[in-house]
Amino acid sequence: MIDWTTKKAPAWFEHNVPKHYPLPRLSDADMIQMVTDIEEVRDLMSLRSYYQAADLRQKELDELWVSEPIHAAKASYGSNYGYYYGKSEVQRWYVDEFQAKRKAQLKTYCEKQGVPEDEKLLGAGCMYMCPLSTSIVRIAKDGQSAKGIWYSIGQQSDLKEDGTASGLWMYLKICADFVKEDGKFKLYHIVVANDQNYQAGTKYDADTYIDPKDDALAVEFGNPTIPMNVHDNTYNWADNYPPMPEPYDTLTPENSYGPEGHPMLKGGKGV
């Protein structure tokens, strides 16, 4: 907690206090390029939200993520519970396991409704939407990468095995790295850090601690390549990871949102 008598906060809290950085002094041409790059990154992340909402995860991975082997090998998807490391690992969990879940839900839905199984009904009873807000995007000084943070108050509705529905509210801090491939920014690393989540119908004065085995988001994240405590939501948004992006010269593993940039793994320990 902050000691309000001295206005002194512990170091971990100070690390994530928002800071203002004035725009750099640039030529007109460089300023136009920087603003164009920022809007390109914002558009990419907005499109990703709509692809997710429409269950177009394979399309997202094919169109919006890195594809060059040097980048694909170190692409990552992180959450509170660890990282999927390497694009093939992201594919395995984010696309393949998700599609298997949707097919199982389709079978349940059709059995409960007494209708023939039809893939046109894939996703019936399910909904996922995480709109993005309050973006901060930094373009590297070398122009070859970008970093961004967004906040999302999202919701997820799923069909359970017994045919009943479950609903979830999610409060998320989303951070990502982007690199240029063929002159276009592509998603390289993403961390979806959950600050809070509540099952629909939960009383707002109820105990907010969720045992990991009962945490729908932890269960859904499966078995990541690197299991670890990436973001401790005991402190909600004030946890110092993932930090807000600051101005930087060039993207390195150590300053990235990939596992190599996490304070516990900095320098490649365990990666």
Predicted regions and their residues:
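Active-site rim elements
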Residues: 34, 124, 162-166
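Low-complexity, intrinsically disordered terminal/linker segments enriched in charged
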Residues: 160-170, 181, 191-271
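Short, low-complexity N-terminal intrinsically disordered segments enriched in polar/charged residues
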Residues: 1-59, 63-67
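A solvent-exposed, acidic/Ser-Thr-rich amphipathic alpha-helical stretch
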Residues: 58-154
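Short beta-strand segments enriched in hydrophobic/aromatic residues
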Residues: 52, 65, 152-154, 191-194
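Short, surface-exposed coil-to-beta transition loops
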Residues: 130-132, 168-174
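Short acidic, glycine/proline-rich loop/turn micro-motifs
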Residues: 74-76, 158-163
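Short beta-strand edge/turn micro-motifs at domain boundaries
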Residues: 2-19, 145-149, 171-202
